Amino acid sequence: MKKIGIIGPNTKMCSAELYNFGVLLGNKIAAKNRAIVCGGLGGFMEAVCKGVKQSPHTFIGQTIGILPDEKASSANQYIDTAIPTGTGIARNLLIVRAADIIIAAGGGAGTLSEIAFAWQIEKKVLCVTLFDGWAKELAGKNLDSRANDLLIPVNSIEEIETFLINL
């Protein structure tokens, strides 16, 4: 089972438009029989997990939340498997490592750190360009000379679906 890493803004920074995009994206990911691995909290992570769980294609264990604290109860209600780490923001590396590919939308400092981790381990990031934030800012760029073409700009859910088919 391929795992899609979901990174983006938390509850405070996630606009209604981005949240709705996340729900639709989650529904499409569920239809492709892929699992989600994310930070397990609110905002964009919750939206994608909600879309997965609302899909007729969902299955138990499809949404995995790698939590920053020590309490599984802090996970959003759409997480099937909550993994409390007690590591704070260091859990960002675990999310990136656990995923086969990353989808980034919007994002602040946490998303930036996850994109940087993905770059360092040469993991592809589909950077949604429809919303302001680090995903849009870094789409199509190289962070340094160690790799090329890992931050792939995507302008629609249909483009994301194309990548998921070939994953």
Task: Identify the meaning behind each predicted range.
Residues 1-16, 26-27, 31-32:
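Generic N-terminal amphipathic, Lys/Arg-enriched alpha-helix
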Residues 3, 35, 62, 124:
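Residues at the starts of beta-strands that form the adenosine-phosphate
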Residues 5-6, 38, 65, 127:
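Structural beta-sheet core signal
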Residues 23, 30-33, 42-116, 131:
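Acidic/glycine-enriched connector segments
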Residues 82-86, 147-163:
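Short acidic-hydrophobic, aromatic-tinged amphipathic segments that line or gate anion-handling sites
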Residues 101-103, 122-125:
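Structural loop-to-beta junction motif characteristic of Rossmann-like glycosyltransferase folds
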Residues 124-150:
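Nucleotide-sugar donor-binding patch of glycosyltransferase catalytic domains
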